[in-house]
Amino acid sequence: MTNTRKTHPLIKIINHSFIDLPAPSNISAWWNFGSLLGLCLAIQILTGLFLAMHYTSDTMTAFSSVTHICRDVNYGWLIRYIHANGASMFFICLFLHVGRGLYYGSYSYFETWNIGVILLFAVMATAFMGYVLPWGQMSFWGATVITNLLSAIPYIGTTLVEWIWGGFSVDKATLTRFFAFHFILPFIIAALVMVHLLFLHETGSNNPSGLVSDSDKIPFHPYYTIKDILGILLLIMALMTLILFSPDLLGDPDNYTPANPLSTPPHIKPEWYFLFAYAILRSIPNKLGGVLALVFSILILMLFPLLHLSKQRSMMFRPLSQCMFWILVADLFTLTWIGGQPVEYPFIIIGQLASILYFTIILLILPTVSLIENKLLKW
């Protein structure tokens, strides 16, 4: 008699995805971040659901409802901080997951890769709208500044911004619709994750060497289920350490002041995970140019399969490309730092140089270095 898990219409899908899935025998801990992102999404949906039970999306009561959650709801403070810091963990895992894909050439599975980039955009949109909901000073002014960027779109810009606002400024209508979108988007993300996995399982996983691993596969369970559980335990430990010892470390003190349209905070800045993109936006003096640079700083990821000129897939055996990759990582850290600094000398020029370097490395230096390495192989 055949096993139920191999014959049952529903269970066999799970079986082919997480149990009897043939996986390369040499994938490292860098391949753990997919499952960690799944965990982060589950944590965010669950904690978000419980927060939504007590939250009110009205400008008069939103700030008070968050205070009420933290003070009066059983373990409300814990749920709120898991949700806020869970977002930071989500982005740490996202950046490492994308970085892994760039380093090991996983972008050559271009359907999987492009859906991943769409997922990144969706998560960024969700996080931005979530940041507006507590209706603190940085929530209000962040929403005002970022939505205002759309007014740079020629001809329809101003109309588009007022349409998104639902009025002539960020107000009750804006908050209500942001709450609605913030609630629905994670479920759309979950659906996209399924498609992401569907395309991944069409080809199978990449591996550190970048070589075809069909001749050397092992079952996902128990080998990688155990490995994933270890990663999950480490993630939960890191998250709970952050929440219980320093829950406001990554937040902005300005957001503990209720939103006031009449007083602008001295430095308007987004959460830390958007600072690199914010620095690129600010480094261009022209409004439309800045918005385009902001969008292309993420959209450029879709060009990686086209810009790959090396004869090898992975960077594992390409020391020159490795060097450029780590310079790119350092550049992103620099941009993140600059994004949190005031707009004054010397930060302006550092931000502009870091932004130029970011696009130059990706569009020019990495492909050129790849061609040099191809020549070195012959030599």
Swiss-Prot record:
Binds 2 heme b groups non-covalently. The chain crosses the membrane at residues 33-53, 77-98, 113-133, 178-198, 226-246, 288-308, 320-340, 347-367. Signal peptide: none annotated. GO terms for biological process: mitochondrial electron transport, ubiquinol to cytochrome c. InterPro entries: Cyt_b/b6_C, Cyt_b/b6_C_sf, Cyt_b/b6_N, Cytb/b6-like_sf, Cytochrome_b, Cytochrome_b_C_euk/bac, Cytochrome_b_N_euk/bac, Di-haem_cyt_TM. Its main location: mitochondrion. A ubiquinone binds at residue 201. The keyword Transmembrane helix applies. Pfam families: Cytochrom_B_C (PF00032), Cytochrome_B (PF00033). Its cofactor is heme b. It comes from the Eukaryota. Heme b b566 binds at residues 97, 196. One of its GO terms (molecular function) is metal ion binding. The cytochrome bc1 complex contains 11 subunits: 3 respiratory subunits (MT-CYB, CYC1 and UQCRFS1), 2 core proteins (UQCRC1 and UQCRC2) and 6 low-molecular weight proteins (UQCRH/QCR6, UQCRB/QCR7, UQCRQ/QCR8, UQCR10/QCR9, UQCR11/QCR10 and a cleavage product of UQCRFS1). This cytochrome bc1 complex then forms a dimer. Belongs to the cytochrome b family. Component of the ubiquinol-cytochrome c reductase complex (complex III or cytochrome b-c1 complex) that is part of the mitochondrial respiratory chain. The b-c1 complex mediates electron transfer from ubiquinol to cytochrome c. Contributes to the generation of a proton gradient across the mitochondrial membrane that is then used for ATP synthesis. This is Cytochrome b. It comes from Xerospermophilus spilosoma (Spotted ground squirrel).
